[in-house]
From Swiss-Prot:
Glycans are attached at N42, N86, N93. It holds the Pfam family V-set. It is found in: Membrane. The keyword Membrane applies. One of its GO terms (molecular function) is signaling receptor activity. Residues 24-150 are extracellular. A lipid is attached at C168 (S-palmitoyl cysteine). Transmembrane glycoprotein expressed by T-cells and natural killer (NK) cells and their precursors. Plays a costimulatory role in T-cell activation upon binding to its ligand K12/SECTM1. In turn, mediates the production of cytokines such as IL-2. On resting NK-cells, CD7 activation results in a significant induction of gamma-interferon levels. Residues 1-23 form the signal peptide. One of its GO terms (biological process) is homeostasis of number of cells within a tissue. This is T-cell antigen CD7. Keywords: Adaptive immunity, Disulfide bond, Glycoprotein, Immunity, Immunoglobulin domain, Lipoprotein, Membrane, Palmitate, Receptor, Signal, Transmembrane, Transmembrane helix.
């Protein structure tokens, strides 16, 4: 287990201890979430009673405001999370989605109900893990398979055609040899038969020198 995960678990255990009274008015979930680089996490902040808006802060390792959300108003997002924050729901039950996670996003996040007497929940610990080489290989494996399968088919057809060509060539040579052999046997018979037939039809001419 990484040091970040151990630290996150310790912080979560510490959060189980009784918190301040104002935490009873703001409920936040989950208490711990672990994700890989590039993934997304959801943090839900719900509260009751009158409030002006919801402020989510990062309180560890560095403290600063992440977002401020108010119904019917344009939300404010810290530039560190620009383009990576989405909202769903109302300010009394708000789900905040942080996407394209980075290692620097690891930390504790707390929701605060903004009103005359502000109240905040405990916190949500977000742990962002470095993407392992195995996960990267799995993400590339379907792409490699899609390329290798057509290639295997093409190679298979190539060798099949090559084998059929060799077989046809061998059969053709055997057939030619058989035809030649049969021609050699039959041609003398035909020639001799013709010659004997012609000899029978040709009259005898006496030799004048005898």
């Amino acid at each position: 287990m990484t040091q970040q995960a151990v630290l996150a678990l310790l912080l979560t255990l510490a959060g189980i201890l009784p918190g301040p009274l104002d935490a009873q008015d703001v409920h936040q979930s989950p208490r711990l979430t672990i994700a890989s680089e590039g993934d997304s996490v959801n943090i839900t902040c719900s509260t009751r009673g009158h409030l002006e808006g919801i402020l989510m802060k990062k309180i560890w390792p560095q403290a600063y405001n992440v977002i401020y959300f108010e119904d019917r108003q344009e939300p404010t997002v810290d530039r560190t999370f620009s383009g990576r924050i989405n909202f769903s729901g109302s300010q009394k039950n708000l789900t905040i989605t942080i996407s394209s996670l980075q290692l620097a996003d690891t930390g504790d996040y707390t929701c605060e109900a903004v009103r005359k007497v502000s109240a905040r929940g405990l916190f949500t610990t977000v742990v962002v893990k470095e993407k392992s080489s195995q996960e990267a290989y799995r993400s590339q494996e379907p792409l490699q398979t899609s390329f290798s399968f057509p290639a295997a088919i093409a190679v298979g057809f190539f060798f099949t055609g090559l084998l059929l060509g060799v077989v046809c060539s061998m059969l053709r040579k055997i057939q030619i040899k058989k035809l030649c052999a049969s021609g050699i046997k039959e041609s003398p018979c035909v020639v001799y038969e013709d010659m004997s037939y012609s000899n029978r039809k040709t009259p005898c001419i006496p030799n004048q020198y005898q």
